[in-house]
Amino acid sequence: MAQITASMVKELREKTGAGMMDCKKVLSEADGNIEKAVELLREKGLAGAEKKAGRLASEGIVETYIHGGKIASLVEINSETDFVAKNEEFKNFAKDIAMQVVASNPKYVSREEVPAEEVEKEKEVLIHQALNENDGKNIPEDKAKMIAEKKVEGRINKFYSQICLLEQPFIKDPNKTVEQLLTDLIAKIGENIKIRRFARFEVGEGLEKKNEDFAEEVKKQMGQ
């Protein structure tokens, strides 16, 4: 299989306007063949999705989800037109995102919203963990640090996938992320759609209480 480089992904994005992860995926499927990758993106309806994402989305809806009267979410999903905001697929997407917030408890919509100090703090923890893993392996200090930093590059993505809504595995189909679900909807509907913000509420949150995993209940319910 051909090695997929950053320059290949960049070239495909410039040709099609598709998202970075989608470009990387189809390049792998096309074994590095740019033209074949372009065809695959068009077949999947993903070409041009990112260009649509640059347009202003100021209409939309606020959706709610309440689980057993104990845990709830509010999400604002924006579209370019009121017509799309009334579309059943758009409304179903909003409902799915409201349930996703309840079940997976993200803190931010995207990694761009995560405060730099929070990221640095997490990186410090991960570096210490990685260095501890090298203890007793008789590795020179400078090389041990280099190995630790490489490990952190991969592990920080897992950190983002836990706290950022767009990077979380979609609760109904863990093989795709919420961002991929959103990109698919943009391509299908033909308008820019944004998950603007959300709020999550849980009875007794912040208070001492018995351990009840409502989020796990929601996941089980959505998997049925």
Swiss-Prot record:
This is Elongation factor Ts. NCBIfam families: tsf. Gene3D superfamilies: 1.10.286.20, DNA helicase RuvA subunit, C-terminal domain (1.10.8.10), Elongation factor Ts, dimerisation domain (3.30.479.20). Residues 81-84 are annotated as: Involved in Mg(2+) ion dislocation from EF-Tu. Keywords: Cytoplasm, Elongation factor, Protein biosynthesis. It holds the Pfam family EF_TS. Belongs to the EF-Ts family. It is found in: Cytoplasm. The keyword RNA-binding does not apply. Associates with the EF-Tu.GDP complex and induces the exchange of GDP to GTP. It remains bound to the aminoacyl-tRNA.EF-Tu.GTP complex up to the GTP hydrolysis stage on the ribosome. It comes from Finegoldia magna (strain ATCC 29328 / DSM 20472 / WAL 2508) (Peptostreptococcus magnus). InterPro entries: EF-Ts_dimer_sf, Transl_elong_EFTs/EF1B, Transl_elong_EFTs/EF1B_dimer, Transl_elong_Ts_CS, UBA-like_sf. HAMAP family: EF_Ts (MF_00050). GO terms for cellular component: cytoplasm. The keyword Cytoplasm applies. GO terms for molecular function: translation elongation factor activity.
